[in-house]
Amino acid sequence: MKNLYHIIIIAALVLLSSACEFKFKPNEELVAEPLCVQRYDRLESRYLTTGDFSALQQMNTDYPIETRTLIEKMLQLGTITDANISNRFLMFFQDSTLQALIADAEAEYANMDDINKDLKKSFNRLQDWLPEIKQPVFYAQIGALDQSIVIGESSVGISLDKYMGSK
């Protein structure tokens, strides 16, 4: 009888814990995202080389601030809300030199594991010196040789096209 009583108590505790969504894991909000370069450049390349409108939609959905910064501030093609901005953006990159640059950047930076490893190592060293610094989001882009690094409030954009050339 005593065992049955213990089983009922344990079952009730498990039921109440799951009903209250009791977590045995650490708070998910406090876990930092892994530090790596987000591949915005791949979406950009897909749109600019194939004209795939779904890639542009995904750029606007997944990277709205980055897309606005690229189109409005870096390339200065107009505002993101212009009716014809997608066509203007696509036509800007139809130059054969820029198309070759996109293809070269895509080939050169197909794998960024070494860059991500160095980034983690460097940022960990920076956090040792400045423990209160918040981890920004790093993303790669193609910027038509305009800027090498773009700094936002909580993001750092790396223009891969500026890092092409002889090693």
Show where each model-derived region lies.
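Bacterial N-terminal signal peptides that target proteins for export
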Residues: 1-8
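C-terminal motif of bacterial Sec signal peptides marking the signal peptidase cleavage site
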Residues: 16-19
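N-terminal mature-domain "stem" immediately C-terminal to a signal peptide or N-terminal signal-anchor/transmembrane
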Residues: 21-91
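Acidic/His-rich structured neighborhood in mature extracellular/periplasmic domains
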Residues: 90-167
